C-alpha cells in the first residue's frame, strides 16, 4: 500500500493552535487551509492561512463544531488531511470517522482509541482492568441526581464532578457538601453539553495537595510507541492549567520510567497512533493514579518540544503519512528545563471572569534563544465572548529551572498588553513567588498563596502619579515641530507667553484618580517610549507607551493604564447603575431564574450567563424584590448591559 500523500492541510480550529500548526505545515512545504466563523473572519489564523473557508455562525456550535461544514471545507479547498488542534472536535470519535469516511486523513488517533479514552468513564474502566491505580469515584452510565448523591456519600466529600467527554476545566465543579450537589451537577452538565455536545458526568474523590504530572506519548502506525518525558501542570485555576513545565521538578529517573512505561502500555492497549498525553495525579509518597488520557496534542506541548528539540506537529504529519518514529526510547533527549504560562483575557481579581473587548495594545516579548511565544492575536483584534479566552503562551527554556524561570520573568516584563483585562500580572507573581522558585508545587498552589498572588489594590504613590503625569503630558499629540527642538512650538506642555510653563492634568488609573499641576523643570523626560525618572539622585528608565487617549506606564513590574479623567461623567455613570445588576462581560443568557415581583434572598441565582464556554451566575447582592427584567433566555448581551433591577426590602 502506497504512503498517503499530504500536500494541503486544513486546521479545524482557531487561535494560537491554528497558527502554530500552520507554521510547521508551511515549513514542511504544505498549503494551509483555515476555517473561520463569521466572528473570526479577520482573525489572525484566517489571515495567516494560504486558503480560508467561511463556516458562518458565531458560536462554536454553529461553526467549529459543525462536522459536515468542516468536511465540505476540506473538499472545497483540496485538503487531503485535517488537523483538529485541541478542544472543539479534537477528541470526537464521530469527527474522526467522518473524516475517514470522506476519504481524508485525520491527524490524530483512530476513532476506536478516541472512543476508548475520550470518555473518562470508559478510560477509567479500561485502566482498572489493566491494573492501573485509580482515584476512588463513580464512572457509571446512570446520570440522575440520586445516583450521584449516593456515589458522593460513598466516596466522601469533597468531590470533583467532571465531564466524561472533555477537559480544559469545562463541566468541572468541586462540591464541598450535599447542599451544593444539585446546582453544581446541573450547571456542569450544561457546560459539558455546550462545550462537547455530551452532558454525561463522572465524580471522583477530590484529593488534597496532589501534583498533576502528565506523560507525553507518541505512537506510529507500525506498533512503535515512545514517551517523551513528562510535564508538571500542577498550578491551575478553575481546574484549568495556567503554568506548565518540563521535566517535573524532583521526579526521580526511576519514577519517570515507571510513569512513562505505564503511559506507553496504556496507549498500546488501545492501538494508539499519534500524539497523546496520559495524565496522572502524583501524591507526596510518589504514588501515581491514572486520571485521564487526552487523545490529541496538548496546549502545553511546547515545553516538551523545548527539552527534546523535537517538533511534535511535524511528527504528527509524518506519522499520518505512514512514516515510522525517527528514534528509540533510549534516544529521546532531555535537555535543560522549560516553563510555559498561558496568557488569558480574564480578570483574576474577579474570580478569573473572562474578558472581552479590543486589544488596543499588544506587543510580544522579543524572540531569542530559549524564548518562544505562541499566540493567535495581534494588536487591534477583537476578543469575542464565543470562545476560550486564551490569547497565547509564553515559553522559556534554560539550562536549568532557575535560568528558565528568570528568562520567563524577563519575557513577562517585556510583554505589553492593554485594552482589556488579562492575567499577565498574576502570571508574573506566580513565577516570582518564592514557593514557585523552590518548586513547591501542587494543585492547591494558587488558593494557598491567593493573598500574595491576588493582592488588594494599594494606593498609588505620589512618585507614580508624578511620573504618570509627566509621561502623559510629554506624550500628548500636540507636539507640532519635530524638526526644531528649540522651537517653542515643539512642545505641547502648557507653555504660555510671559508665564512659566505649566499644565494641569486630571488622571485616572485602576479606579484611582489624581489632579496634578506640572511646572517646568521636573527631573522627568520622555524619549520615544523610554521615560527617564530621577528621584533622590537615582535615575531609572521606565517604559511609557502612548496608545490613543491612553498611556501605559511600566511601574513596579506592572503595566498600568492611565487615562484623562472626567469627574462629572464618572458621577453620572455611577448613578445610572444604582439598583441594577449588569452583565460582567459579553455573552448569551442561558437561564432566567426569576420573575418580576419575585422576592429573593441574598445570594440567590437570578440569571445565568454563558461566555467563553463557561457559565457565570448573576446573584442577588442582598435580599430584595425583582423590580424589572431586561433579558430573556437566548439573548446576546454586551458587557455593562442591565439584566435585572432589584429593589431592596
Regions found by a protein language model. Give the residues of each.
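Structured functional modules or segments
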Residues: 571-649
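Conserved nucleotide-binding/hydrolysis modules and their immediate coupling elements
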Residues: 519-542, 548-549
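Structured core elements
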Residues: 10-11, 54, 83, 160, ...
